[in-house]
Regions:
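Positively charged n-region of N-terminal signal peptides that target proteins for export
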Residues: 1-4
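Bacterial N-terminal signal peptides
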Residues: 7-16
Length: 502
């Protein structure tokens, strides 16, 4: 008999390795037993290219095999795998977990039959024999980062720097933390591939630290670490048992949206309303993932979320997407919420509408699986509901940003406004953000220094993206804003031109 756990993003108990001094980033000592070595050889024969052996994954697999031998109801459930990985000091975000039960002499053949021929860079096998039956767990992981040593246990109030290097082809690492109370913190990142990010652990409890990186398929989780502060448990809080998966797709999607809104409610946020046009975009991407057999934000047959929304004529200011895969739609959503960066998307304060799409499929092993896409959007803001004009709101946003930066306020300049307005009209006509000699025309007003920022935005407040607002050399500013639909950038866009001079 074989069972497969396939949670992915796009994630008798053995004692943890010694708490004091236990660090991620160092492979612990764990030599495979004779039975484990035979099973591992079957893995290396089945998976090509043959994965390397990870002692940390071996230890985690042994804990899970012991759970299976003891009669645990769901021995390789996602939460159990996550806790076993933490106890074994493995930072793999979502390894595939396969459970095989067979007579000891039949283990290699049973393992070979059970594996779905995935790709993997590292593997670990754990085996426990009980009453003539071998319980074998195989963990297969695609590693995306190499971490420097980082503590698994810290004191409340401790600080530590997470550092490491992304593996090719990944870049632009960014680190997120979910605090014990559910707050998500964006701790910063780097252009990559090397990174070093200082982290703080202000209180006791279970912290989840995540490294997200940009890959060929968009952002992916590169590493996931559980850090216990003040002696906290490495196990995640128990979740309420999910209801059986509804047979029809729409009901499953509605259940995920309800779960998403329940999480928002626990954090004091208003619910997002169902948006059928967004759900249609989400469902098509879930189907594309199922057809490709992989979890990713970008696929050859399905571009990034922004392009998909624009192609469907859906106006939005900002869009946030989660993708995941698991045995059921709610399990996939729970896997997404276990990721700090994905949870941050669920908790976006400006999001007001959302669409959920799923696609059911079967893994190579024959096990059923569900591909999930969640898209939350912030509405566009053309300024129509404000007593201020879009131009005035852009100036107001620039004033606020200058004050936040501790810089002198900018003076509005009517001559510069006229130049910026003409530039914005020109951009809308050509459907292309370009400066078109605007800085030279500003210098023609007998100014010594000029710079220009132009962009297409979903609202006046997006003007804080203006790169030159932080330059203390500038004292005057001109703003031009024109609203309209764009074939390239979507509906209800604002073309914004900002020109700065001394």
């Amino acid at each position: 008999m074989a069972r497969l756990s396939s949670a992915a993003l796009v994630l008798a108990v053995l004692p943890a390795l010694a708490g004091a001094g236990a660090e991620y980033g160092r492979e612990p000592a764990a030599a495979p037993t004779r039975l484990e070595a035979r099973a591992l050889e079957a893995v290396r024969t089945r998976v090509r290219p043959a994965p390397g052996t990870s002692p940390a994954l071996v230890l985690a697999a042994r804990e899970l095999a012991a759970r299976a031998a003891s009669g645990a109801r769901e021995p390789i459930a996602r939460a159990a795998v996550r806790a076993a990985l933490a106890r074994a000091l493995a930072s793999d975000p979502s390894p595939a977990a396969v459970l095989v039960e067979a007579a000891p002499d039949e283990v290699p053949a049973a393992v070979a039959r059970a594996l779905p021929r995935p790709s993997a860079t590292h593997a670990g096998v754990g085996a426990v024999e009980r009453d003539g039956t071998a319980f074998v767990v195989v963990l297969l992981s695609e590693r995306r980062a190499r971490l420097d040593p980082f503590p698994r246990e810290v004191a409340p109030g401790a600080q530590a720097a997470l550092s490491g290097t992304l593996l090719a082809p990944f870049s632009r690492p960014r680190v997120f933390i979910t605090r014990p109370g559910g707050e998500v913190v964006d701790a910063g990142g780097a252009a990559g591939p090397a990174f070093r990010v200082p982290l703080e652990f202000p209180g006791a409890g279970r912290h989840v630290v995540e490294v997200v990186a940009e890959g060929e398929g968009g952002p992916e989780v590169a590493a996931l670490l559980t850090v216990a502060a003040g002696g906290a448990s490495l196990d995640a809080p128990a979740r309420t048992a999910a209801a059986p998966e509804p047979a029809d797709r729409s009901s499953s999607e509605a259940g995920v949206l309800a779960a998403l809104n329940a999480t928002r409610a626990r954090h004091g946020l208003a619910p997002v309303t169902a948006a059928p046009e967004v759900a249609a975009v989400a469902r098509r991407h879930a189907e594309a993932m199922a057809a490709a057999g992989r979890v990713a934000h970008v696929l050859p047959a399905s571009p990034d979320a922004g392009a998909r929304l624009r192609g469907a004529g859906v106006p939005y200011r900002r869009a946030y997407e989660n993708v995941a895969r698991a045995g059921t739609a709610l399990e996939a959503h729970a896997a997404a919420e276990d990721s700090p960066a994905h949870l941050a998307n669920v908790l976006r304060t400006g999001a007001t509408r959302a669409g959920v799409g799923i696609a059911r499929a079967r893994l190579a092993s024959g096990d059923p699986t569900v591909y999930l896409t969640e898209i939350l959007i912030e509405p566009t803001d053309d300024g129509a509901a404000s007593p201020l004009t879009p131009d005035a709101r852009v100036r107001e946003a620039l004033w606020r940003e200058r004050a936040r930066l501790g810089l002198a306020p900018l003076t509005a300049d009517a001559a510069l406004d006229a130049l910026a307005r003409d530039a914005a009209e020109h951009m809308r006509t050509r459907d292309e953000p370009e400066t078109d000699g605007l800085a030279d025309r500003a210098l023609g007003l007998r100014r010594r220094l000029a710079a220009v920022d132009v962009f297409v935005a979903g609202g006046p407040d997006d003007a804080v993206r203006s790169a030159n607002v932080k330059d203390a050399r500038f004292a005057r500013v001109g703003v031009g804003v024109v609203a309209g639909d764009s074939a390239r950038f979507g509906k209800a866009r604002l073309w914004i031109a900002v020109v700065y001079t001394d």
